Each structure stands twice: as C-alpha cells, then as structure tokens.
Amino acid sequence: MKTDIHPKYVAAKIKCACGTVIETRSTSGDISVEICSNCHPFFTGKSKLVDTTGRVDKFKKKYKMK
C-alpha cells in the first residue's frame, strides 16, 4: 500500500454561534456552524414561531379572517 496518501486526522473544535464548543477530530481543522444540537429547536423542544414579512396577516386578509 502507498504511504502518506491519507489526510492528517487532527483534533478540531466545532464552534456554534450560540457559544457551544464541541471537541472532535477532523481532517479539515476547526469548524464554525450557525446552529447546533444545543440550540436547534428540534433537539431543545422549544419552538420559535417567527412571523416573517407578515405572512399570517396576509393570509388572514386574503381569506377575510379576523
């Protein structure tokens, strides 16, 4: 087999925007993510309902609901 054909497998840190740091190993080094299992609504059980651009109001107006 050929030697030195595999990438280096080094210790890495995954840093989330919420401040969580997870230590793991990777071939690409440190990784930055926007959302992780500590802050994702699916894993936390806390749902955030965001009405972006008034979609609910637009729906109610379209179907004449109060």
Curated annotation (Swiss-Prot):
Stated name of the protein: Large ribosomal subunit protein bL31
Residues in the signal sequence: none
Alphabetical list of PROSITE patterns matching this protein: RIBOSOMAL_L31
Comment on bound cofactor: Binds 1 zinc ion per subunit.
Subunit details: Part of the 50S ribosomal subunit.
An example Gene Ontology biological process: translation
GO MF annotations in UniProt: metal ion binding; rRNA binding; structural constituent of ribosome
Originating organism: Leptospira biflexa serovar Patoc (strain Patoc 1 / ATCC 23582 / Paris)
GO cellular component, one term: ribonucleoprotein complex
Annotated InterPro entries: Ribosomal_bL28/bL31-like_sf, Ribosomal_bL31, Ribosomal_bL31_A, Ribosomal_bL31_sf
Free-text function comment from the UniProt entry: Binds the 23S rRNA.
A Pfam family matched in the record: Ribosomal_L31
Keyword presence, Transcription regulation: no
Cofactor: Zn(2+)
Similarity section: Belongs to the bacterial ribosomal protein bL31 family. Type A subfamily.
List of residues binding Zn(2+): C16, C18, C36, C39
Record keywords: Metal-binding, Ribonucleoprotein, Ribosomal protein, RNA-binding, rRNA-binding, Zinc
